[in-house]
């Protein structure tokens, strides 16, 4: 896998902080004079959301409110090309559309039908993102991911599980 430190450009910064700390988020935006935010902070394990929904509400709902508050304050101070090119990219999930039967499909126009605390928290964050776009004009883009893969991913997730089974010649 690739690390940020492997990138030739040094204008990409990874900041490890608490998404619920609005002042810290705003400080990071203004300190680095950003022109895009790629929001990847989330609690994302469906089973854990059932046994411990509070952390999902905190990170995925209160955290997005904190991020939106900081982003709006930052965006309000931008002028010219910086304002014209600024974007907040919000990573969501296909889980917001609910469970599908084997032959069903959905599009981004499908109604939300969350079926777990995780998907409900992500649907809530999607609604907040859209509200900030429509109410305040904050430029946003939501991406609904499914079965993403990366280092340190939990082994029961689809892609690591499939790879593991293939390596063991299992179905």
Where are these regions (language model features)?
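C-terminal substrate-binding subdomain of Rossmann-fold SDR/epimerase-dehydratase oxidoreductases
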Residues: 13, 17-20, 160, 166-171
């Amino acid at each position: 896998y690739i690390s940020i430190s492997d990138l030739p450009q040094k204008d990409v910064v990874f900041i490890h902080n608490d998404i619920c700390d609005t002042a810290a988020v705003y400080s990071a935006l203004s300190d680095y004079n950003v022109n895009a935010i790629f929001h990847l902070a989330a609690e994302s394990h469906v089973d854990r959301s059932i046994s411990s929904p509070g952390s999902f509400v905190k990170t995925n709902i209160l955290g997005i409110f904190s991020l939106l508050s900081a982003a709006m304050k930052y965006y309000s101070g931008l002028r010219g090309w910086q304002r014209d090119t600024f974007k907040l990219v919000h990573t969501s999930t296909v889980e917001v559309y609910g469970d599908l039967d084997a032959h069903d499909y959905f599009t981004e126009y499908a109604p939300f039908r969350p079926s777990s605390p995780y998907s409900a928290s992500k649907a809530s964050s999607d609604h907040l993102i859209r509200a900030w776009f429509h109410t305040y004009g904050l430029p946003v883009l939501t991406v609904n991911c499914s079965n993403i893969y990366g280092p340190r991913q939990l082994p029961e997730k689809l892609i690591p599980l499939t790879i593991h089974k293939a390596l063991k010649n299992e179905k």
